[in-house]
Amino acid sequence: MEGIRRAAQRAVEEFLQAFPMGPGSLFVLGGSTSEVLGERVGTRPSLEAAHAVLEGLLPPLLERGVHVAVQACEHLNRALVVERETARAFGLEEVAVFPHPKAGGALATAAFLRFQDPVVVESLKAQAHGGMDIGGVLIGMHLRPVAVPLRLSVRKIGEAVLLAAKTRPKLVGGARAVYTREEMLKKLEEFLPKPP
């Protein structure tokens, strides 16, 4: 389990280096502990593996003031475990259910046990700024548009394939639009007074 914890920690540290999430950001985690242990999703939930993943992932995120949502399995319609404070901050609707390893999954259950004031919410309303998918459980529905894949050097947590994504604001405009501050300042040069 120590190898799982270390891999999760390395992955989230690399993620945060590539995409520095600030205080108040929302990170979504989806994962299958069965896949982490080399089994097919849903066949071997493990609270021990779930706690190892969370021990690696949570501290770097929480130290930065990032809100964390942990996705439950399809039996709970991909509902998510969050802190009550997170639900309030993002206007999320609480649902009346308690996860367990066979209905919700081990990762959501472990998060519910670890969080200080946990609630389960129906959806993130596509407000997550970034996230990780451990084992191909699909988190895209929770991400803001536009999602951008992050290629990390950590490719697996245990035996589970690791996918990561950040998001960026939509690019709007047409042929004359610019998308960086540098481009904007260059365009402004033609409007500045010329020296005599």
From Swiss-Prot:
It comes from the Bacteria. Transmembrane segments: none annotated. Gene3D superfamilies: Hypothetical protein TT1679. Signal peptide: none annotated. Pfam families: DUF436. InterPro entries: Antibiotic_NAT-like, DUF436. Belongs to the UPF0340 family. This is UPF0340 protein TT_C0214.
